[in-house]
């Protein structure tokens, strides 16, 4: 009996030493796969149905339309108008992809298109808008990112539909694409315009 317990003991010790490593690897793999499978656009915004943040942001200096400085973000600008608020940056690759779609949206005068320039250098932001055209009637500069936090932004680009009463009715996480523009964003805009 003592021979069996002696021979089983090293195997048991080895197993007990390897068990935490196996558990760690298993948890790491589970975390990795779950992390990659999440869709951030499915995370509901706590701001839906609530008033848009009372955020005042300075204009992007030097950005002009018809030889007039494009105004910054003023909370009063949302009252009585349906607005599409896009949080963007020149360093954001998906922002470059969605820029032509925003330019097309900017032609629709039934609503105002507002831009929040997030943690960007002014020269780069102006160059970005010069390259694609400025679709925004207002561009507020959020140099430190605090205003975007108030809007519930955790990455760029993000787009919000704000109703006439100044309440957020929809939030799109990620870039505007032809698919989500047609299937989600435009229907949300039409609903807000009624």
UniProtKB/Swiss-Prot annotation:
The answer to whether UniProt assigns keyword ATP-binding to this entry is no
List the CDD domains hit by this protein, alphabetically.
TlpA_like_DsbE
Matching PROSITE patterns: THIOREDOXIN_1 (PS00194), THIOREDOXIN_2 (PS51352)
A GO biological-process term: cytochrome complex assembly
PANTHER family for the chain: THIOL:DISULFIDE INTERCHANGE PROTEIN DSBE
Q: What is this protein called?
A: Thiol:disulfide interchange protein CycY
Q: Which gene encodes it?
A: cycY
In this protein, which residues make up the domain named Thioredoxin?
46-190
The family annotation for this protein states: Belongs to the thioredoxin family. DsbE subfamily.
Q: Name one GO cellular component term.
A: outer membrane-bounded periplasmic space
UniProt function note: Required for disulfide bond formation in some periplasmic proteins. Also acts as a disulfide oxidoreductase in cytochromes c biogenesis. The cysteines of apocytochromes c must be in the reduced state for covalent linkage between the two moieties to occur.
Q: Name one Pfam family in it.
A: Redoxin
Record InterPro entries: Periplasmic_diS_OxRdtase_DsbE (IPR004799), Redoxin (IPR013740), Thioredoxin-like_sf (IPR036249), Thioredoxin_CS (IPR017937), Thioredoxin_domain (IPR013766), Thioredoxin_ResA/DsbE_sf (IPR050553)
Per UniProt, subcellular location reads as:
Periplasm
């Amino acid at each position: 009996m003592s021979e069996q317990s002696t021979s089983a003991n090293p195997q048991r010790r080895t197993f007990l030493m390897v068990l935490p490593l196996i558990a760690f690897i298993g948890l790491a793999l589970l975390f990795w796969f779950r992390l990659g499978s999440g869709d951030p656009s499915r995370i509901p915004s706590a701001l839906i149905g609530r008033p848009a943040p009372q955020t005042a942001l300075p204009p992007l200096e030097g950005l002009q339309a018809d030889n007039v400085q494009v105004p910054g973000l003023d909370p009063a600008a949302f009252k009585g108008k349906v607005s599409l608020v896009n949080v963007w940056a020149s360093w954001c690759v998906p922002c470059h992809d969605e820029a032509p779609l925003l330019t097309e949206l900017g032609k629709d005068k039934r609503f105002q298109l507002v831009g929040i320039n997030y943690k960007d250098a002014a020269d780069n932001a102006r160059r970005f808008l010069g390259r694609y055209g400025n679709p925004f009637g207002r561009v507020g500069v959020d140099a430190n990112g605090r205003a975007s936090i108030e809007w519930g932004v955790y990455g760029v680009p993000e787009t919000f539909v704000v109703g006439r009463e100044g309440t957020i009715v929809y939030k799109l996480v990620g870039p505007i694409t032809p698919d989500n523009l047609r299937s989600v964003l435009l229907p949300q805009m039409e609903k807000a315009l009624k």
